[in-house]
């Protein structure tokens, strides 16, 4: 799950490698396509502090931060005063690309109301325009956005001093999936020929970026790692949670801080309820109700020290505020290490 520490994730990966299991994260039903697109295109990024200090143009593409992460605009992106943005919101231009009207689009300077599932076509048209060519007129009918509006948006992006695009699930879950994200990252690379531009992913959980970072560092792949052959294999669509459950290839599951059944298709959730489940969680949820064994979780960064990745992929280390309330475990990492030790003893 995305609400546990990187140390716990590392312990889970080590346990999965020893057992020859498949280890996956919540990214598989969330921002997995974003991680795939990032690995395809490469990323030009920056810390949240750099964007706060420098950015005079903010683009929210397929995201609605005022409802998803309400503090994002006020703390990092739009309203705070930075060194080169001393007047806060008055020194910034905000563009929202979203099929629907939202609170974020109402508070933007420009709203691009594209048709649903046409992110790929709009990004392709912008890349065509940035290369000095005209896109095919049919793109207006497909995307619902006029070429003149695209040109206006592109000019705003090229003329800014420092721009940042925040992509959300809207771009990663529409038709095209990771190819949409790949084009967005390529657009940012092309914009850097004209000005300074970076891109960031808006995630929902406190450590949603942590598993991708930890797994990529240790094994080279961001999610969906299969250790059945003794070494990591990666093939989204085969070794990922939804596909394994749909094909009924899983005979048991260990879930850590993950209310997984809330995000799964009905067929997968029904099969998940049929197999043995061990759950480590701090909250009562639908997954704890169907689990065979429930181990109480420890609140990372509150009841134990931990490391978590911020939305801009910066690791944040936190000390504990209070001690773990349990005498049998200090943290979720400690729980997994105890399970790992017992597993080794049994397998011997």
Residue ranges and their predicted role:
Residues 195-215:
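Short, conserved secondary-structure transition motifs
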Residues 28-196, 218-348:
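Non-catalytic alpha/beta scaffold blocks inside enzyme catalytic domains
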Residues 1-45, 49:
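Long, structured ligand/cofactor-binding scaffold of large enzymes
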């Amino acid at each position: 799950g995305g609400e546990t520490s990187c140390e716990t994730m590392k312990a889970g990966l080590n346990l999965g490698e020893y057992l020859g299991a498949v280890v996956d994260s919540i990214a598989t039903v969330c921002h997995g396509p974003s991680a795939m697109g990032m690995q395809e295109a490469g990323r030009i990024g920056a810390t949240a502090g750099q964007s706060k200090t420098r950015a005079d143009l903010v683009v929210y593409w397929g995201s609605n931060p005022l409802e998803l992460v309400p503090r994002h605009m006020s703390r990092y992106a739009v309203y705070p005063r930075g060194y080169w943005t001393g007047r806060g919101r008055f020194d910034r231009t905000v563009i929202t690309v979203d099929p629907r009207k939202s609170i974020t689009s109402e508070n933007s300077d420009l709203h691009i109301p594209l048709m649903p599932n046409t992110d790929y076509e709009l990004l392709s048209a912008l890349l065509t325009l940035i290369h000095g060519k005209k896109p095919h007129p049919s793109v207006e009918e497909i995307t619902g956005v006029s070429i003149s509006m695209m040109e206006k948006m592109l000019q705003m992006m090229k003329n800014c001093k420092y721009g940042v695009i925040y992509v959300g699930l809207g771009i990663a879950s529409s038709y095209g999936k990771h190819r949409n994200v790949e084009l967005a990252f390529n657009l940012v690379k092309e914009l850097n020929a004209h000005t300074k531009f970076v891109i960031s992913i808006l995630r929902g959980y406190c450590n949603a970026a942590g598993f991708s970072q930890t797994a990529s560092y240790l094994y080279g792949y961001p999610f969906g790692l299969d250790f059945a052959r003794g070494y990591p294999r990666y093939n989204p669509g085969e070794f990922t949670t939804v596909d394994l459950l749909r094909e009924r290839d899983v005979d048991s599951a260990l879930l850590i801080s993950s209310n997984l059944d809330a995000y799964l298709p009905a067929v997968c959730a029904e099969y998940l309820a049929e197999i043995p489940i061990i759950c480590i969680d701090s909250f009562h949820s639908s997954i704890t109700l169907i689990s065979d064994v429930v181990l109480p979780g420890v609140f990372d960064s509150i009841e134990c020290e931990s490391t978590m990745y911020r939305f801009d992929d910066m690791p944040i280390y936190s000390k504990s505020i209070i001690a773990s309330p349990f005498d049998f475990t200090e943290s979720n990492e400690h729980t997994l290490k105890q399970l790992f030790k017992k597993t080794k003893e049994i397998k011997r």
